[in-house]
From Swiss-Prot:
It comes from the Bacteria. GO terms for cellular component: outer membrane-bounded periplasmic space. Belongs to the bacterial solute-binding protein 1 family. It comes from Escherichia coli O1:K1 / APEC. One of its GO terms (biological process) is transmembrane transport. It is found in: Periplasm. This is sn-glycerol-3-phosphate-binding periplasmic protein UgpB.
């Protein structure tokens, strides 16, 4: 009988352990962070899980921003959505209209966890807030602005001052020509051409991208990025391309790899590219502000954010939402938000994270690491430079890419391409406007 008692005790212990394991609430988190950024996401999740054994955040890379958004919406329609979905900033209007989301302020309220929305940097939180209530719909996570990365060693070889990156686009054109002449394969390349060369070019130089304050004041907005200032800028890049000083290398972040492998001497790319540049560049590099148009009045103005936020999906149980609230609260804590900012190059999303980073001496030890934040806070945003809230914006970006590519290949003039992009984009805006009223 004694062995039987031991067997029964072991069985009871095993069942207890199984019950305990089953009590852990699994929280799927779909994201678009790859490479070093993906490793940092995994690290955050592992730390949260260790501190909160009743919950398990499971991060899963689901492809680039467009692919992740499509996968998330498709999964929601079949009842298989993740609890947390990372969506890039131009997907905000789409998510708001999708009826697939649970506003983060509701998630925190129902979980009984205090949520101070004022802790977030206003120019970031304003992008993801309900225009009517002012409450956050999603939680800022990896916000960025475009910055200029430049190869200091290549600058020296070309006779340029490695401490003085170009301040204006006119300067950049001159620098690119000298760098190409010195033997570089590529003087300048740009990542995310629509976001940088039109969306941020417009804001940085105090120009609207669309009417209705870039869509914040209504879904009946129309695109306005085919004005003389934007046309002149694209024409300058076209001329650089003809001379071989500007190289078009892709629609997304391809220019970052071209930079850190030494092919391109300069690139404008996301501040969030810093993690990979820091990891892979084998030369001295610097970080500068986005160039501005020397002819623009009162430029530079302020940069608008890129990157993404975290959306909570509908259809989950109470315990899952409590775990989600705890995880989002964990991410916003000063020490965690500051570490994410410092390791990745993304903006400090809270004031406390910025203050902590400064107090730790990070900016003194890493010159240029505060460039993205300084650009965002350069001047108080104008009504039409605080961001974009345009329906079908992901598809509009594809149109912009197609039309800009027609310029780089010589098929269209800058004016023709931007006029066509505006016309095609407005058709998508009207389609979105109609869908929100039906």
């Amino acid at each position: 009988m004694k062995p039987l008692r031991y067997t029964a005790s072991a069985l009871a212990l095993g069942l207890a352990l199984m019950a305990n394991a089953q009590a852990v609430t699994t929280i799927p988190f779909w994201h678009s962070m790859e490479g070093e950024l993906g490793k940092e996401v995994d690290s955050l999740a592992q730390r949260f899980n260790a501190e909160n054994p009743d919950y398990k955040i499971v991060p899963t890379y689901k492809g680039n921003y467009e692919q992740n958004l499509s996968a998330g919406i498709a999964a929601f329609r079949t009842g298989n959505a993740p609890a947390i979905l990372q969506v890039y900033e131009v997907g905000t209007a789409t998510m708001m209209a999708s009826k697939a989301i649970k506003p983060v302020y509701d998630v925190f309220k129902e979980a009984g966890i205090q949520f101070d929305e004022s802790q977030f940097v206003p120019t970031v939180s304003g992008y993801y807030s309900d225009s009517k209530t002012g409450h956050l719909l999603s939680q800022p996570f990896n916000s960025s602005t475009p910055v200029l990365y430049y190869n200091k060693d290549a600058f020296k070889k070309a006779g340029l001052d490695p401490k003085q990156p170009p301040k204006t686009w006119q300067d950049l054109a001159d620098y690119a020509a000298k760098l190409k002449a010195s033997g570089m394969k590529c003087g300048y390349a740009s990542g995310w051409q629509g976001w940088i060369q039109l969306e941020n070019f417009s804001a940085w130089n105090g120009l609207p991208f669309a009417s209705k304050n870039n869509g914040f004041d209504g879904t009946d907005a129309v695109l306005e990025f085919n004005k003389p200032e934007q046309v002149k800028h694209i024409a300058m890049l076209e001329e650089m391309n003809k001379k071989g000083d500007f190289s078009y290398v892709g629609r997304k972040d391809e220019s970052t790899e071209k930079f850190y492998n030494g092919d391109c001497a300069m690139t404008t790319a996301s501040s969030g590219s810093l993690a990979n540049i820091r990891e892979y560049a084998k030369f001295n590099y610097g970080v500068g502000m986005m160039p501005y148009d020397a002819d623009a009045k009162d430029a530079p103005q302020n940069a608008i954010i890129g990157g993404a936020s975290l959306w909570v999906m509908q259809g989950k149980d109470k315990e899952t939402y409590t775990g989600v609230a705890k995880f989002l609260d964990f991410l916003a804590k000063p020490e965690n938000a500051a570490e994410w900012h410092q390791k990745t190059g993304y903006l400090p999303i809270t004031k406390a994270a910025y203050d902590l980073t400064r107090e730790q001496g990070f900016y003194e030890k890493n010159p240029g690491a505060d460039i993205a934040t300084r650009q965002m806070l350069n001047k108080p945003p104008l009504p039409f430079t605080k961001g974009l809230r345009l329906g079908n914006m992901p598809q509009i970006r594809v149109i912009v890419d197609e039309e800009l590519e027609s310029v780089w290949t010589g098929k269209k003039t800058p004016q023709q391409a931007l006029d066509t992009a505006v016309e095609r984009g407005n058709q998508l805006l009207r389609r979105f406007e109609k869908s929100t009223k039906s």
